[in-house]
Amino acid sequence: MNFLAAAIAAGLAAFAASYGNGKVISKTIESMARQPELSAQLRSTMFIGVGLIEAVPILSIVVSFLILFS
């Protein structure tokens, strides 16, 4: 049962992070197309947002390992 719980936790976190990253990147590209003069500022903000979104699956993997090995 622990294997199933760990797999579900990691899988849902990976799915949610990939969906969130896709939305952030698509909206950033859309904004860059509308206002090219802000592309540098938008790009740096996008990288910060993607980094924060990627923290969730990393924490989920840690929780999955705790579920598996405890």
Swiss-Prot record:
GO cellular component, one term: proton-transporting two-sector ATPase complex, proton-transporting domain
InterPro entries in UniProt: ATP_synth_csu_bac/chlpt, ATP_synth_F0_csu, ATP_synth_F0_csu_DDCD_BS, ATP_synth_F0_csu_sf, ATPase_proteolipid_c-like_dom, F/V-ATP_Csub_sf
UniProt entry tagged with the keyword Ion transport: yes
Main location class: membrane
Keywords assigned by UniProt, alphabetized: ATP synthesis, Cell membrane, CF(0), Hydrogen ion transport, Ion transport, Lipid-binding, Membrane, Transmembrane, Transmembrane helix, Transport
Stored HAMAP family: ATP_synth_c_bact
Protein name per the record: ATP synthase subunit c
